[in-house]
Amino acid sequence: MGEIRLVNIGFGNIVSANRIVAIVSPESAPIKRIISEARERGTLIDATYGRRTRAVVITDSDHVVLSAVQPETVAHRLTARDASLAAAEEEEGEE
C-alpha cells in the first residue's frame, strides 16, 4: 500500500498526508457549506482547540478537518516533509 505520511495541522494534531485532497481557507460560502454539511453528516473534525478556524483540510474519505493554522503553513509542512523524504531517498540510492 505504501508508507503512511503524516502532517501536523497544529496543536499536536496530525492528519494522514496521503488522504488529503485539499487545504483551503474557510472564508468562502462554498467552503462554509462544506463545513456545515460535514457537521450534519458527522464527518467534521474540529482540531482548532476553540481558536479561529484558519484552514479546512478535506480528505478523500469526505472528512473535513478544521485547523487553527494557516493553509499555507499546513501546505509548507506537507511539502517540506516531501522534500526531506526525497533527499533521504537520494542519499540511500548513492550508497
From Swiss-Prot:
InterPro entries cross-referenced by the UniProt entry: RemA-like
Domain of life: Bacteria
Residue ranges of coiled coil: none
NCBIfam families from the UniProt entry: MtxBflmRegRemA, PRK04323.1
Protein family: Belongs to the RemA family.
PANTHER family with a match to the protein in the record: REGULATORY PROTEIN SSL2874-RELATED (PTHR38449:SF1), REGULATORY PROTEIN TM_1690-RELATED (PTHR38449)
Name this protein carries in UniProt: Putative regulatory protein STH1338
Organism: Symbiobacterium thermophilum (strain DSM 24528 / JCM 14929 / IAM 14863 / T)
